[in-house]
Amino acid sequence: MAKATFFYFLFIGYVWPIDSVMFNLAPNTQKCLKEDIQANQLVMGEYEVSDVPGQIIDYVARDTKGHILSQKEHITKGKFSFMSEVYDAYEICFISKVPPHQRGIPQEVSLVTKKGVETKSYEGIGEASKLKPLEVDLKRLEDLSDSIVRDFILMRKREEEMRDTNEKTNSRVLFFSIFSMCCLLGLATWQVLYLRRYFKAKKLIE
């Protein structure tokens, strides 16, 4: 029983990831982190920046069309959230700004992000519904399973779209190849007939 419980909690820890990253941002540069996110998903993040006097770091979250979803200047430590309207590649950028007269140094940036079911507070849900810890974990796994199923459905849909696109492309390439061959055959036939008439006119052939 203890062994089964161990593997159960190991499974929970494995399938319940939280994206966390830490990096150094050079002076007067920017670094963007990009990820594909499904439609209608809540994205939450928490950031912290090492303090360097005279240096400023801003952050902005946006989609591929440039629509700003969240933005803040002069950040040090805080949280943000936004809702994805459509399936897209969303990016979070950190921008360093250092005055020209100052010699800047790299700043350390840490970022933790959650999305979808990861943003739910299952502890609060358990307290409100008076659920046992094991029941809360089962609820978490149920929601995560639904999320995985939706991901697979989306992947399958994208695969079908890509396959349809490939089939259409192959059909167009085949049509273009046949059309090109017909044009070449027509041109070759025209050249033969033209040369035949030319040589007959010059009485080089009968």
UniProtKB/Swiss-Prot annotation:
Signal peptide, first to last residue: 1-17
Superkingdom to which the source organism belongs: Eukaryota
GO cellular component: cytoplasm; membrane
Gene Ontology molecular function: any one: cargo receptor activity
PROSITE patterns in the cross-refs: GOLD
Biological process annotations from GO: dorsal/ventral pattern formation; endoplasmic reticulum to Golgi vesicle-mediated transport
Lumenal topological intervals: 18-172
Record's keyword terms, sorted: Developmental protein, Membrane, Signal, Transmembrane, Transmembrane helix
Limits of the GOLD domain: 30-140
Subcellular location: Membrane
Major localisation: membrane
Membrane topology: Single-pass type I membrane protein
Transmembrane segments: 173-193
Topology, Cytoplasmic side: 194-206
Family from the record: Belongs to the EMP24/GP25L family.
The protein's role, per its UniProt record: Eca and bai are essential, though not redundant, for dorsoventral patterning of the embryo. Specifically required during early embryogenesis for the activity of maternal tkv, while the zygotic tkv is not affected.
Protein name: Transmembrane emp24 domain-containing protein bai
Species whose genome carries this gene: Drosophila persimilis (Fruit fly)
Record lineage: Eukaryota, Metazoa, Ecdysozoa, Arthropoda, Hexapoda
This protein's encoding gene: bai
